[in-house]
Amino acid sequence: MYVCLCNGISDKKIRQAVRQFSPHSFQQLKKFIPVGNQCGKCVRAAREVMEDELMQLPEFKESA
């Protein structure tokens, strides 16, 4: 599913970036992929996908 239509970023692309870079904030994620830097309508959905994927990572599961 496309999350950011302006830049053609899908939830899959966000999840891949989270697994690869383990960003600790949405601002960090934006350094790796161009999400939320145009109209901003995707920010909430992109953040939710990022947080969901972070919770799946082993290092975050242990600290939760």
Swiss-Prot record:
Keywords: 2Fe-2S, Electron transport, Iron, Iron-sulfur, Metal-binding, Transport
Superkingdom of this protein's organism: Bacteria
Cofactor binding description: Binds 1 [2Fe-2S] cluster.
One Pfam assignment: Fer2_BFD
CDD domains assigned to the protein according to its UniProt record, in alphabetical order: Fer2_BFD (cd19945)
A GO MF label: metal ion binding
Alphabetized InterPro entries for the sequence: BFD-associated_ferredoxin, BFD-like_2Fe2S-bd_dom, BFD-like_2Fe2S-bd_dom_sf
Effect seen on changing S63I: In strain: ECOR 30
Cofactor(s) required, per the database record: [2Fe-2S] cluster
Keyword Electron transport: yes
Protein residues bound to [2Fe-2S] cluster: C4, C6, C39, C42
Quaternary structure annotation from Swiss-Prot or TrEMBL: Monomer. Interacts with bacterioferritin (BFR). Up to 12 Bfd proteins can bind to the BFR.
Task performed by this protein: Required for mobilization of iron from the bacterioferritin (BFR) complex.
NCBIfam families the record matches: PRK10509.1
Family in the record: Belongs to the Bfd family.
Protein name: Bacterioferritin-associated ferredoxin
Species classification: Bacteria, Pseudomonadati, Pseudomonadota, Gammaproteobacteria, Enterobacterales
